[in-house]
Structure formats: structure tokens, C-alpha cells
Amino acid sequence: MWRLLHCILGFIRLYLDGVKVLLYQLFNKSFRLPDLPEQNGKVAIVTGGTRGMGYEISRHLVSLDMHVIIAGNEEEEGLAAVKKIQEELNQGKVEFMYLDLASLTSVRQFVQRYNAKGLPLHVLVNNAGVMLVPERRTEDGFELHFGLNYLGHFLLTNLLLGALRKTGKPGKCSRIVIMSSATHYGGRLTLDDLQGRLCYSSHAAYAQSKLALLLLSYHLQEQLLVRGDPVTVNAVDPGMVDTALYDNLCSPAQVAKKPFAKLLFRTPAEGASTAIYAAAASELEGIGGLYLYNGRKTESSALSYDKRLQTKLWKQSCALVGLK
């Protein structure tokens, strides 16, 4: 009975958040990117950069003369994305590197391979994610939304902090961009059951993962500020975007989504615009700790600003991935 109620509440919260976003998108134009400065060979990693918003982020950063590493778990798709970008653009550099965020071993191997290249790291865009996946576990035993969307990015970010710190300089900070979502407003974080073992709902699991990413963003930014590190962290809400994230909707919801998607959803390029802005806009130099929606600073949920919760999640995450 409790499991059923939990599923229903998660479903209701997620779709209420969705309705609010659609109403906003109905009456407000999508954020239009301003002219952004040339990046002069700066290096960026974009997770999930093979398709959808990740591809659009990668393509646009390459167009600004960035060296972009597309990180993904589908090599054939990744190489195809690289080829397409190279054919479209005459500047910048793009390459693919294998990364499975659902595997902590793969995350560590990716960072080892990246560090072996001897490249600096100016921008890390944590974009990859899954949504509404039926109950599954990662190879490390974590619930998939929590393990891939959040925990994989948590480990990746921490392992790349050395490169980001080394690259950043006062007045020229390295940047971390974390893709959250409006679903975080309805998210709840159950620290004694982060894996949803007691009561699983794919809707609640997705919302929890997006709240966790926001808690990570705020806590990490504060840590970096205290240390005086030349690295900033900002979270981004892309809005409701017509991408493959919705492939796991049930059949009736898929049918209902189609007309709404054409009328109200953002395109992947539109959804990517705020993340691109966070990664490259000169007016955001040295500024972190923001939640950006449609190109503007926005208030996130009250729960996301809970410093005790941020700290508890950080400590628990370190224990789960084996960081001291």
C-alpha cells in the first residue's frame, strides 16, 4: 500500500512540475544566446554529448573554437557525432572518449585516460542522464537514476577537480556546469534509502537525482570559494525539451506527449542554450552558485539550500564512491 502511494505521489509531483514548466514555455520565448567570445582552444568535457542537448552543447562550444571531448557510453554514436560536427564546422576540435557513468570503474578509467593526455580542463558540463527508467541497478548496485545521473557525475567531478583547479586562474576561472531540472522542486531526498529499496518510484527517483545534483552544485561551490580555488559551479535547468529522455514514458503518456511536444517543448538547441551560456559567457566569469533557467538566475527549491542536507549528502556520497 505504501509503495503504491509513494509511486502515486512521485508521479503527481513530477507531472505538476511539468505542467508549470509548460505553462511558462507557452507564454515565454526561449532564451536566445547572446554573442559569446571565442574560446581560443579551451578544453571542455561534455557528458552525454552524442545526441540531444549534449550534442548541441558540444557543437556550439566547438563553433566557439573549443576543444571538446564528448564523453558517452555508445562509441559508434559518439564517433558519428564527432564526424557530423567536423563536417559542419571549420574550427575548434572535437573527439570522443568512452565513459559509462553507471560504472564507477569506468569513471575512474576515463579520468586516468584524460589525465594521460596532458590536457588542461577549462569546462566540465555534466549533462548525461536517464529518466523514468524501470527499476534497475548499476553494476555497483546503485539505483540507476541516482547512480548514473548523480553519483557517476559526483565521482567524475571530484576526480577532475585537480585538472580544473590547475587550469583555472584568477579572472579566468574554470567552470563546472551541472544539468538539473525543474523536477527537483518536487524531489525528496531520503538519506537512509537513497537507492529506493524500501519503496521504488521511477518518477521520485528521477526527481531525487536532480535535487541531489543541485545540492552538489551548491555545496561544491561553497567549498571552492572557501579554498579560494579558481573554479565556479553553476546548475542549469533546460526546461522541457523534446529529447530521447522521454522514451521511457508509458504508451498512453507517449501518445499524449506528441502534440504538446510540438507546441510547447523546447528543441534540443533551445534547451542547450542556457548550459552553453553558463559554459562560455564572459558576464559569468568568477560567478558560481547559481541556478539558471532560461538564461536567468532563478530561485531553486527551499530544500536545495539546506546546508545540513548538502553536507550529509556529500559525506554519504564520498563513502559510496570510496573518496576520503
Curated annotation (Swiss-Prot):
**What Pfam families does the record tag this protein with?**
adh_short
Show the GO cellular component annotation of the record. lipid droplet
GO biological process, alphabetically ordered: dolichol biosynthetic process
Tell me the InterPro entries matching this sequence: NAD(P)-bd_dom_sf, Sc_DH/Rdtase_CS, SDR_fam
Q: Where in the cell is it found?
A: Lipid droplet
Name the enzyme group at the top EC level: oxidoreductase
Q: Which Gene3D superfamilies match?
A: NAD(P)-binding Rossmann-like Domain (3.40.50.720)
**Coiled-coil spans in chain:** none
Q: What keyword terms does UniProt attach to this protein? A: Lipid droplet, NAD, NADP, Oxidoreductase
Please tell me where NAD(+) binds in this chain.
206, 210, 243
User: What is the reported phenotype of gene knockout?
Assistant: Impaired fin pigmentation. Mutants have fin melanocyte pigment pattern defects and fewer xanthophores.
Organism's domain of life?
Eukaryota
Q: Which residues form the signal peptide?
A: none
Could you tell me what reaction this enzyme catalyses? a di-trans,poly-cis-polyprenol + NAD(+) = a di-trans,poly-cis-polyprenal + NADH + H(+); a di-trans,poly-cis-polyprenol + NADP(+) = a di-trans,poly-cis-polyprenal + NADPH + H(+); a di-trans,poly-cis-dolichol + NADP(+) = a di-trans,poly-cis-dolichal + NADPH + H(+); a di-trans,poly-cis-dolichol + NAD(+) = a di-trans,poly-cis-dolichal + NADH + H(+)
| Single Gene Ontology MF annotation | polyprenol dehydrogenase activity
The positions flagged as active site in the entry are: 206
Query: Is-annotated flag, keyword Amino-acid biosynthesis?
Result: no
In which pathway is this protein known to take part?
Answer: Protein modification; protein glycosylation
Q: Give its E.C. classification number.
A: 1.1.1.441
Family named by the database record? Belongs to the short-chain dehydrogenases/reductases (SDR) family.
| Its biological purpose | Oxidoreductase that plays a key role in early steps of protein N-linked glycosylation by mediating two non-consecutive steps in dolichol biosynthesis. Acts both as a NAD(+)-dependent dehydrogenase and as a NADPH-dependent reductase during the conversion of polyprenol into dolichol. First catalyzes the NAD(+)-dependent dehydrogenation of polyprenol into polyprenal; polyprenal is then reduced into dolichal by srd5a3. It then catalyzes the NADPH-dependent reduction of dolichal into dolichol.
Q: What is this protein called?
A: Polyprenol dehydrogenase
Which gene is this protein's source?
dhrsx
